[in-house]
Amino acid sequence: MANVVVVGAQWGDEGKGKITDLLSEKAHVVVRYQGGVNAGHTLVVGGQTFKLHLIPSGILYPDKRCIIASGTVIDPEVLLAEIDQLHQLGISTDNLFIAETAHVTLPYHRVIDIAEEERRGIYRLGTTGRGIGPTYADKAERMGIRVVDLMYPDQLRERLSWAIPYKNVLLEKIYNLPPLDPEPIIEQYLAYAERLRPYVTDAALLLTQAIEDRENILFEGAQGTLLDLDYGTYPYVTSSHPIAGGACIGAGIGPTSIDRVIGVAKAYTTRVGEGPFPTELKDEIGAYLGATGAEFGTTTGRQRRCGWFDGVIGRYAVRINGLDCLAITKLDVLDGLDEIKVCVAYEYQGREIRHFPSDARVFAQCKPIYETLPGWKCSTKDCRSIQDLPPEAHDYLKFLAQLMQVPIAIVSLGASRDQTIIVEDPIHGPKRALLYPNGGKRAHALMPD
């Protein structure tokens, strides 16, 4: 295999969990490198559905080491509930490792997150209310609690005995909320610590050893490129770095250790929460995509906003992440449509632009410029090769590859593992930079011309 990063190429919810699950078969180590319980992925294996938020998708393979790395923020209550759920389903977590340097979400983070959203009013960001932003804020302010702090009861008690009264000042003076009682929180987190203790390790050192042993490592990002703190639709973003570069910081490895980057995108576009969304459909087609695609968030249950595929943000994701290939998911959701539109550029103040604007105010005024392609009436759910697809579906995928100038290696046609077409080996196929040596072209069913 290689050391591979899987990233979302849109606003999250692209189906990264399924793709990671598929690729995990050839990996020795699977790493979640950022985010927290604000992200979720759903896996369907053998008729069983698994909904996970923190634990890497590779946990379903008992011989894969699964690491929750330093770049994540960990809610012990949710993590332990996931561990218990897996145990109830007969799945071992002996292969799970938690970075001792990851930061911990506490009750005051969740309370502040919800209170701050309410305080923002019409300027709310649409957070999940799970305390992720406040946890990362404490990390940046160097006042956070880390997993390693949980391992030392006296130190944890001392840190929380200072932190909780500090946060109570904010709760009372800024948000007009009652203060939190420190003692129950301290006792609860001491109990969490004992249950988590067997999993805690120096994850960066573990990864370094795996790299030195030439093991195959799969890095699993949460959310998506357009939610990146620096490169997303700021301020409507997450508080970490879902992009490929975030894998290095979040996991504690050097950039030369990454061999390949795979982007995951839906065959259309969705977004949860607030923020600009040029191709959003507020008509019956948008409702059809939402209903057919079961577009409800794994974490919050909120209905996702749906729209046509946006090639502008797609090209941006290719550039920002250095994508080598794409996995296109939920192609089957487009079955039955008479025509399908793809955004190829934006109109802004009477002129055409083909780049993603960094200013959210500009982005909010962008109108999509569409190319219209014919749809297909037959089902694609049972297709298992490119040749099985209706010609219109094949042409649609070819158009996306051409638009984004990156090959499509995987096509997903449903939630199950077997509802997948492997067009080209996503691990050992050509890197995008090598597709056209000496000006030549490489034949590929879904390769840009």
Curated annotation (Swiss-Prot):
**Gene3D superfamilies tied to this protein:** Adenylosuccinate Synthetase, subunit A, domain 1, Adenylosuccinate Synthetase, subunit A, domain 2, Adenylosuccinate Synthetase, subunit A, domain 3
- The answer to whether the entry has keyword Metal-binding is yes
E.C. number, please? 6.3.4.4
Q: How is the cofactor bound?
A: Binds 1 Mg(2+) ion per subunit.
Question: Does Protein transport appear among the keywords?
Answer: no
Instruction: Enumerate the SUPFAM superfamilies for this protein.
Output: P-loop containing nucleoside triphosphate hydrolases (SSF52540)
In which domain of life is the source organism classified?
Bacteria
Q: What is its main location?
A: cytoplasm
Q: Which InterPro entries match?
A: Adenylosuccin_syn_GTP-bd, Adenylosuccin_syn_Lys_AS, Adenylosuccinate_synth_dom1, Adenylosuccinate_synth_dom2, Adenylosuccinate_synth_dom3, Adenylosuccinate_synthetase, P-loop_NTPase
Where is substrate bound in this sequence? T298, T299, T300, G301, R302, Q303, R304
Q: Where does GTP bind?
A: 12-18, 40-42, 304, 330-332, 412-414
Q: Which cofactor does it need?
A: Mg(2+)
Enumerate the SMART domains for this protein.
Adenylsucc_synt (SM00788)
- Pfam families given for it? Adenylsucc_synt
Reaction(s) catalysed by this chain, per the record, are: IMP + L-aspartate + GTP = N(6)-(1,2-dicarboxyethyl)-AMP + GDP + phosphate + 2 H(+)
For molecular function, the Gene Ontology terms on record are: adenylosuccinate synthase activity; GTP binding; magnesium ion binding
Task: List ligand-binding residues for Mg(2+).
Answer: D13, G40
What is the recorded function of this protein according to its Swiss-Prot or TrEMBL entry?
A: Plays an important role in the de novo pathway of purine nucleotide biosynthesis. Catalyzes the first committed step in the biosynthesis of AMP from IMP.
Question: Could you tell me what this protein is called?
Answer: Adenylosuccinate synthetase
Q: Which species is this record about?
A: Synechococcus sp. (strain JA-2-3B'a(2-13)) (Cyanobacteria bacterium Yellowstone B-Prime)
